Design a protein with these regions (language model features):
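Hydrophobic, membrane-inserting alpha-helical segments
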Residues: 1-8
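Catalytic toxin/effector domains delivered as secreted proteins or via bacterial secretion systems
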Residues: 10-178
Length: 178
């Protein structure tokens, strides 16, 4: 069942979110969730240590616990949008990194404000079970030392973990399996 709310109610919710859920500060730990296949294609098998984390929707790490399964992740973060690569039958990847940018915004203050459902335009996910503040980064940011990537199977178990470290000899930033 889809419930529609009035424009004034959305504005009230946006003001509430702006006041009580401030944008991530520089150096605050944020999370980006990506499909496992994207991690393999763009990160794990890439030889370019300067590969970007990309832009898009992110959350503060402190705002939620990693879900116990792909199914729970999809529901909690509302990753069930049209064309999604996320599936209850596949694993997922969580990238945790220090926010390098002062430009992470509430999504209703960005071009994302016209997205279709399940996007709510309130700054919160639209899950039936929980509400998680969400933000949008339009900056393409690079991986840096101490950024962490964890690969989860469909049951929410960590199967691989990586950290960016600086090579002592070449001084290049490299993935190191933990």
């Amino acid at each position: 069942m889809i419930v529609y709310i009035e424009k004034q109610e959305i504005i009230w919710l946006q003001n509430f979110v702006t006041k009580y859920f401030p944008r991530p500060k520089v150096d605050e730990i944020i999370r980006k969730v990506i499909p496992e296949e994207d991690f393999i294609k763009y990160y794990k098998n890439a030889k370019n240590s300067e590969m970007s984390k990309g832009a898009g929707f992110v959350t503060k790490a402190e705002d939620y616990a990693i879900p116990n399964s792909s199914n729970e992740l999809i529901e909690s973060l509302r990753l069930d949008y049209s064309g999604t690569k996320f599936s209850k039958d596949k694993g997922f990847v969580v990238i945790e990194y220090k926010n390098p940018s002062p430009n992470v915004e509430h999504p209703f203050n960005t071009s994302q404000s016209t997205n279709r459902l399940p996007y709510t335009n309130t700054g919160m996910t639209g899950s039936k079970h929980n509400i998680i503040p969400e933000y949008h980064s339009s900056d393409i940011v690079k991986f840096d030392v101490d950024d962490v990537v964890r690969v989860y199977d469909k049951n929410g178990k960590i199967i691989e973990s990586y950290k960016i470290v600086e090579d002592n000899i070449t001084k290049e930033k490299i993935w190191k399996k933990q």
